Amino acid sequence: MDLLYRVKTLWAALRGNHYTWPAIDITLPGNRHFHLIGSIHMGSHDMAPLPTRLLKKLKNADALIVEADVSTSDTSFANLPTCEALEERINEEQLQNLQHISQEMGISPSLFSTQPLWQIAMVLQATQAQKLGLRAEYGIDYQLLQAAKQQHKPVIELEGAENQITMLLQLPDKGLALLDDTLTHWHTNARLLQQMMSWWLNAPPQNNDITLPNTFSQSLYDVLMHQRNLAWRDKLRAMPPGRYVVAVGALHLYGEGNLPQMLR
């Protein structure tokens, strides 16, 4: 990389975050400018509407880039294979933890009897978010997608909903690690959600090297975070000259092996 690019990158890092939302600006050689936003896929009523300054950034951008277009994609888990009884797929301790959390969330355990383990984990996580007052229509990426449509902006998917489902279907042991991590780090997950909400409601991180609680096993982190960051990095590096607003899950912006570090 040329010296001028390195100087610009260092200067941007020294300036720190000057936005009222979690975001990092990255400029790549070839006049490519990315405004990376730490999105939350479900948000609270207080997180709408989006900041005026952010909407102006979108207006001045050439395109909006998201993980998947959740405004049009059918992400319902239809036509999934039926699994054997839950008691035959998880151990006694995991079953007891699942029953306890299901009762706490007001979910009938029978709902999970033949669902894939990764799907059970995602249903639990979504229900937990709802209990904290979060709704999909207030999610940051959903609001950005609606604004992009109003502004007639192109929308580019980093992976798309269908590829996300394929990735989940290919998890080792049919997603056992994802369910186990969800059960084990249940209360930590709730605190992490509240922390990410505060980045939008109160103040974003001022230090891009913040330490976040680890709620994934290493093998799962590699699949759900590291490998996806690598794929997204390659896709962003291949973009033509222009200005882009990029919305990815907030955890992809901070912590170990984050997307901005890979792009720099």
Positions of the model-derived regions?
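Structured, acidic catalytic/metal-binding patches in enzyme active sites
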Residues: 3-11, 20-216, 220
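A conditional alpha-helix N-cap/helix-loop micro-motif detector
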Residues: 16, 47, 137, 225-229
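A cross-kingdom marker for long, charged
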Residues: 222-264
